[in-house]
Every structure is written in C-alpha cells, then in structure tokens.
Amino acid sequence: ASEPAWIAVSDPQAGVQLLAHMRKMLGDSVSAFELICRAIIDLLLTGVPGHEDPMQAVHPWYVLMDVTSQGPPGSLHGPLSDALAGAQEEGLIRDALIAASGTQAARLWRMRESLAEAQLSAGGSIPHDVSVPVSRIPEFIRRADAALVATYPGIRHCAFGHVGDGNMHYNPVRPAAIAAASTPFVAP
C-alpha cells in the first residue's frame, strides 16, 4: 500500500520538523519526503503543460510525502490522517491533501518528476546537488538565498529535494527579464 500526501508548510524549518513528527508517528513507513519551494511550482505551472496546482491556496513551501507498507490498499490512510492532524495541531503544517486515487497520486509524483523540465522552460538553471545534515537544511537554504539575492538581484532560487537523506537540489534560475530576453546572465 502507498499513500502520497501533498502538504503545505511555512518554511524549510517546518518541513524538517514535520519529517521528525512523521517519523515519530509513522516510523519506517515514511518512504519519501520531498521539500519543494513555491518558486519552482510556479515555474512548473507556467512552463510545463498538463500540470495543475494541487491546492487552491498558495503556500511558500510544500512537502510531497509517501508512506508505504505491505498492508492492503487504504491501510495507511487512517494512520497518515492522524499523523497529519497531529502535525496541524502542533502548527507544523498549513494544509494537507492525501491522494484520493491512484490517478491523483500519479499526478503528484509527475509534478515532482517534472521539476527539471520546469527550470529549462524558465531559461535554464545552475543545478547543484547539495548534501546537508537534515537539521541544517533550513540554515543552508536561508544563507544561500540571501547570498544569491545580494549578488544577483532578481535571481529566482529553486530548492527541492530529499529532506530525509539531506540531499537538496539548489538551482538558481535566471531572473525572468533576462530569461525572456535570452541574454547572458553575468555577475555584476
């Protein structure tokens, strides 16, 4: 059985805290935990046909999480719902959607798998795979974002990745005006 969920969080710190909460509540059944910034979702929705926002409200960060077990289909729905309710009570999440069907689950994972294409549609990116201790992911993103914005005004920073193992994709994307003009992006 597999139960994917799309979860809105306020920031990377809430995402890391949510991972700890879900592991405490669901143990080893947490099989995937992807932190995704809103900026790359916007690139996906505008640049790659066939995708739609899973939630009506816009949030700054999301988690695509999957829990799996050898049990029958649907056996994880109750425990996942309870764990998410507890996370909401603790203020860790803003909203959550548990995939209601195999089709919806596939759409959520197709979004994650299309993030590289989204960056290409925005004029390309400078991809980085960064290994960071899980507890330091929020600090890394905060410091990297600040350094990029200070050096390259208007740059779009796209962070997403496997929080559970500390592997993040941190991919700056050219400012929209430069990407649209197809001009080189050179440091000031």
What is each stretch, according to the model?
Residues 1-188:
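Noncatalytic alpha-helical scaffold of FAD-dependent oxidoreductases
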